[in-house]
Amino acid sequence: MKKMMIATLAAASVLLAVANQAHAGATLDAVQKKGFVQCGISDGLPGFSYADADGKFSGIDVDVCRGVAAAVFGDDTKVKYTPLTAKERFTALQSGEVDLLSRNTTWTSSRDAGMGMAFTGVTYYDGIGFLTHDKAGLKSAKELDGATVCIQAGTDTELNVADYFKANNMKYTPVTFDRSDESAKALESGRCDTLASDQSQLYALRIKLSNPAEWIVLPEVISKEPLGPVVRRGDDEWFSIVRWTLFAMLNAEEMGINSQNVDEKAANPATPDMAHLLGKEGDYGKDLKLDNKWAYNIIKQVGNYSEIFERNVGSESPLKIKRGQNNLWNNGGIQYAPPVR
């Protein structure tokens, strides 16, 4: 009887392992079969995911999607975008409507452990702040007692604002909206005294207002908001591809490799780690079930992390956001990537 039970358990373990292996590569197989990555993005946030007059999307989150496509197909254009509201985003990922969520989404324990999803890294370290009109004369968020606060529904902001006002013995009236641009319009019309959101989003929304210079972001950052890509939990293979797409961008910046000099660096790698990253030594693409030029393709077609940051939200963009925490670890920030080795 005991031997039979052991045999049954062993057989069940084998079947479970086979099932898990089959499930593990499901997303990559589906993506390769259809020929593109279906990427869930925000419904209109300058600097992160925003469509121009011709319908072309750009932004940090969009560039992550392009990077994944470059890694998988060697072609960053093989991606289709699904704009999603904060309420829609998780359902779209869980249902398989999108392969990847790259939509200024905060990494939290409940989302990572309780919703069947997995965060692959942090593309942008952020924090919640407040946007208000300069005529209000406010210098600090601690002067917002009694304020009416515009908030986007379905975001961490609702909870963090409630916690902040409670901790500081202040009262407020929340007014929620499904879309970020609706919140901005309500603020501009005077329906709210202030708008609460991730600071990066506040800068992005400010440039869409009629007179951006009249609006100020108060100095307080009231929370930690690590924003990053999200995939369905259980597909380790796809998780690794999305994770190492970001790591390739960060490693490239640290090594001084960018979209303009990547061919020169690949022709004469200065270090073994550089040779590994650019596919000149070793067979590291095999671990991801990708071509060994997967990282080269990301850097060549999309750029390193610095290029992506500066053109979308930094010095080369209308937002002019400083790197701050998003600098590399060796330049005063906390961005860091493991080596390809």
Swiss-Prot record:
Keywords associated with the record: Amino-acid transport, Periplasm, Signal, Transport
GO cellular component: outer membrane-bounded periplasmic space
Segment forming the signal sequence: 1-19
Annotated PROSITE patterns: SBP_BACTERIAL_3
Coiled coil: none
Cellular compartments annotated: Periplasm
Superkingdom classification of source: Bacteria
A Pfam entry, by short name: SBP_bac_3
InterPro entries (alphabetical): Bact_solute-bind_prot3 (IPR051455), SBP_3_CS (IPR018313), Solute-binding_3/MltF_N (IPR001638)
GO biological process terms on file: amino acid transport
Record function comment: Probably part of the binding-protein-dependent transport system YdhWXYZ for an amino acid.
Protein family membership: Belongs to the bacterial solute-binding protein 3 family.
Protein name: Putative amino-acid ABC transporter-binding protein YhdW
Species in which this protein is naturally found: Escherichia coli O157:H7
Chain's gene name: yhdW
